[in-house]
Amino acid sequence: MRNDLSIYRTYAANWWDGSQRFLRLLHNLVPPRLAYFDTIVGSWRGKTVLDLGCGGGFMSEALARRGATVVGVDPSEEAIRVAQAHAESEGFKIEYEVGYGESIPVADHSVDCIVCVDVLEHVADLDRVFDEVQRVLKPDGVFLFDTINRTPLAALVIVHLGETIFRLLPRGTHDPRKFIRPSELRVKLRKRGLAVGPFVGLGPRGFNRRFDFTFGRLPSVQIMYMGHAWADPHGKAASGSAVAVSGQRLRNAAM
């Protein structure tokens, strides 16, 4: 069962105007996520990148700014319309499509990288999503993601404090039963022939002038974590050595 994500339709028109605190928090998460992904990919220029669950386009535009050819997919028609309009106003040529992770509207083996943030803990069928990830990635492609760990601490911080007490997020955004342990994620990806690199913690590191959280890497993966996986023809898991994507060497992001 998929989470109730009607908030992304309700607030789509406010995606870029800074009026909604939870959207500002999503925007503030882009720099640390991208800083980590940069260490894996190196140069984005010339790569075809799928932003899976793109929402109103925060990550898509950041990737386009780095020179990637970006395809953004999201189930919210309202968010896609906002993303397309904003990209055009900024001069970005980003292809946006309405679609779900369980049935990605992208051709087989057509993308160099998939970026999937704030998504995996919401989808209806995680196994189907990973089947689709495997299908659309090129043989030397890389899957970059983040999600929320299924721990009591994550449920306390994200749901009880974040949604109920401090109301940083709309209530009902997250179902802690859908949070994903790193060990579970690793097993699912390996079943699909993907080697998995080390996981990296992600969380609040301070405040900005609007007293919104800013984010960065953390030593613990007990709440949120980032990771990457890639097609491994030899069936070997990540071991801390470099891996190849589109002819370039990727550096593992072990802390």
Region spans (language model):
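Conserved SAM-binding loop and adjacent beta-strand
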Residues: 18-37
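Conserved SAM-binding loop
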Residues: 34-42, 47-155, 227-229
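N-terminal, positively charged/glycine-rich alpha-helical extensions of SAM-dependent methyltransferases
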Residues: 1-17
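Acceptor-substrate binding/catalytic loop of class I
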Residues: 147, 167-184
